[in-house]
Amino acid sequence: MSKGHSLQDPYLNTLRKEKVGVSIYLVNGIKLQGTIESFDQFVILLKNTVSQMVYKHAISTVVPVRPIRLPSATDADGADAEPGNA
């Protein structure tokens, strides 16, 4: 996994697995809402009443409807999470 995806992939995967609703803001200001059905290196499949394939290069911001907790190596040991991952 490349260094650029070390946060992006676990973040998107947690949103997908927990079916957390998201607002995705595009670089042109358009707001899309739904749940992340799938994603790869280049696109996110966003599900609402229909599925939309959204190219990552067009995305400005991904905002979940609730806080999420990212899995980390320290969580597996039972230790406290790193600052900022609460």
UniProtKB/Swiss-Prot annotation:
Homohexamer. It comes from Pseudomonas syringae pv. tomato (strain ATCC BAA-871 / DC3000). Residues 9-68 form the Sm domain. One of its GO terms (molecular function) is RNA binding. Keywords: RNA-binding, Stress response. InterPro entries: Hfq, LSM_dom_sf, Sm. Belongs to the Hfq family. This is RNA-binding protein Hfq. Transmembrane segments: none annotated.
